[in-house]
Structure formats: structure tokens, C-alpha cells
A protein has these predicted regions:
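Short amphipathic alpha-helix used as the core "switch/output" element in two-component signaling
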Residues: 58, 80-91
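Acidic, metal-coordinating helix/loop segments flanking the phosphotransfer/catalytic sites
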Residues: 49-67
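Alpha4 helix (beta4-alpha4-beta5 surface) of REC/receiver domains from two-component response regulators
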Residues: 81, 102-122, 129, 133
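Two-component/phosphorelay signaling modules centered on CheY-like receiver
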Residues: 30-48, 138
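Acidic catalytic/metal-coordinating carboxylates
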Residues: 51-52, 78-82
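Active-site residues of response regulator receiver
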Residues: 27, 71, 99
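Receiver (REC) domain active-site loop signature in two-component systems and cognate sites
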Residues: 74
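Non-catalytic signal-transmission and effector/linker regions of two-component phosphorelay proteins
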Residues: 1-22, 127-141
Length: 141
């Protein structure tokens, strides 16, 4: 028997297939970007990955991506710094922050008040299914 959650997920995938969301993933851990890329591409997302935030910014072009997944803690430039630089050139792209650390969303908002505009905050580990749900919700927000 198919559960209501499975039916909702199937409807989500139908909307993703129709839209073909373009996603940039930036995480210094190559295993994470590889797993997310494979999982999202299997669900009809168009995915570009970077393991270096400086390189990601240099390759970023306004309008090229619908959604960004940015790891918070990376060497060279953290996810918040990358987000601010990207927002200076494209204020329409939607972002989802990602972290493996225990800081709560509230702790980050205290340090980074601009996070009020951020609608998506994910903690590793996360399943591909949950990632897809959150990204579709973000895209439709």
C-alpha cells in the first residue's frame, strides 16, 4: 500500500521534473557534493558542484541558478561570506545553508542577522528525499 507521504513525494517529483531546478552546491567535502549531486540529478535537478567557495563565486553568474546549497564552514570563505557576495550580484537566487555542526539556527541568527531572509537551513546528515522536499519548498516560497 502506498502511503500519503509517498504520494506527496511523487507529486513533488512531478513538479521538479516540470521545472528542472538548477542548483549550485558548494561544500568543501567532496563526498557530500558527490552524493547530493547524484541524488538530486536522479530526481531531475540540474546540478553544478564546487568544493572551493572562491571558485564557486568566480564561476557564479546571475540567473544561472534557481537554488544554492552552501555549507557554512569552509576554508577560504565561509558560506555566509559567499552568500553575501552572491547576493550583491543576484538578489533573486534562493539559498539553503548546510552544516554538520551543532549550532542552532537561532545562534546563527544572533551572529548573522541577515539570516532573517533565509528560509532554508539544513543539518547534516540529511536524506536525499528530505533534501528534495526542502529544495522544492524553497523554490516555491
Amino acid at each position: 500500500m502506498v502511503s500519503e507521504n509517498d504520494l506527496k513525494y511523487d507529486r513533488l517529483l512531478t513538479s521538479v521534473q516540470a521545472k528542472k531546478y538548477r542548483v549550485m552546491i558548494v561544500d568543501d567535502e567532496q563526498d557530500i557534493t558527490t552524493i547530493f549531486k547524484m541524488g538530486l540529478e536522479n530526481n531531475q535537478f540540474i546540478v553544478t558542484t564546487f568544493n572551493d567557495p572562491v571558485e564557486a563565486f568566480s564561476e557564479f553568474r546571475p540567473g544561472l541558478y534557481d537554488l544554492l546549497i552552501l555549507d557554512i564552514r569552509m576554508p577560504g570563505m565561509n558560506g555566509f561570506q559567499l552568500y553575501r557576495k552572491i547576493r550583491n550580484v543576484d538578489n533573486k537566487v534562493k539559498v539553503c545553508f548546510l552544516t554538520a555542526f551543532d549550532e542552532s539556527r537561532g545562534e546563527f541568527r544572533t551572529s548573522f542577522p541577515f539570516l532573517e531572509e533565509v528560509k532554508c537551513y539544513l543539518k547534516k546528515p540529511i536524506t536525499v528525499r528530505d533534501l528534495v522536499r526542502r529544495l522544492v519548498d524553497l523554490a516555491n516560497s
